[in-house]
Amino acid sequence: MKVVLFYDQGRAHSVAAICEVLCAQGCAVTPHAIEQVWNDTSPCSTPLALVQDATHVFFLYAHEPMRDPAFIFFSGVACGRGMHVLLLATTTEVRDIHVFRDLVFLLEEETFEDFFRVEHERFVRQKKKRVARTALLERGYPCFEENFIATVMDGNIDIVNLFLDAGFSAALKDARGTPVLSLAVREGQDEMAAQLIARGAPVDQLSDDRAYSALMEAAQIGNRTVARLLLHAGADPNVRGSNGQTALVLAVGRKDHVLIRLLMDHGANPYLEDKLGLSAQGYAKLFNDPTLCTLVGV
């Protein structure tokens, strides 16, 4: 983030302190005295060259800036190039500016440091997105949701990280309403599931088809590794699907003693009944399995 600071002599005494504040917020600052800009005849330092690589143009005036042709020129150039134009409102004259009000951000002395902190964070995020999108295109992955979903199912962690850096959400669902985390679990992509969780995928997000959470998907296929990972990430073991079943019921149905113990240790409720009126305890009794009954507290 490169800030070009234009100031008049009335505010020259403040420049060093303001530059120090902006540098502390991660901004590269280049100050220019307005009075000298128009007198500089060096061929390598034309007025346009001063803002060539700038992302923000920041004005610091002791008087009403609309009287200054430099303000009109540089703010116009900045707006035309899509740059942010900032003006520190230090006097009543400056605060009362009406022309360009829709194009210029008026900052207060008490809050401009916070503005640049937030702005720098936003700039870094946007730059990260641009870099990631360029990298995706260079590797042959146009930035479409379908491509993101396909790479999740393929287990391509490097490309998925680029999609996430490019602004795609770890909470995205496919066309059928299945969250990408659940897709990774269904496809047996354990490392992908771990990465999505680390990047903020909601662990209790439900699929639209059967209202299963990722933990229920893991329980259905007996994936203890992912089940443990999800539980450690705070997954609710008592989420119920459209049929009323829980991850514990599914684990009992598989007679998976290790998974049952894992779920019980994380607060799974063995009394919750499905739409058939059977709970995990009920199924354990139905199977007439003493070990299952013991595990679920019968």
Curated annotation (Swiss-Prot):
Pfam families: Ank (PF00023), Ank_2 (PF12796). Keywords: ANK repeat, Repeat. It comes from the Bacteria. InterPro entries: Ankyrin_rpt (IPR002110), Ankyrin_rpt-contain_sf (IPR036770), Dendritic_Spine_Reg/Scaffold (IPR050889). ANK repeats lie at residues 143-172, 176-205, 210-239, 243-272. PANTHER family: M-PHASE PHOSPHOPROTEIN 8, ROLLING PEBBLES, ISOFORM B. This is Putative ankyrin repeat-containing protein TP_0502.
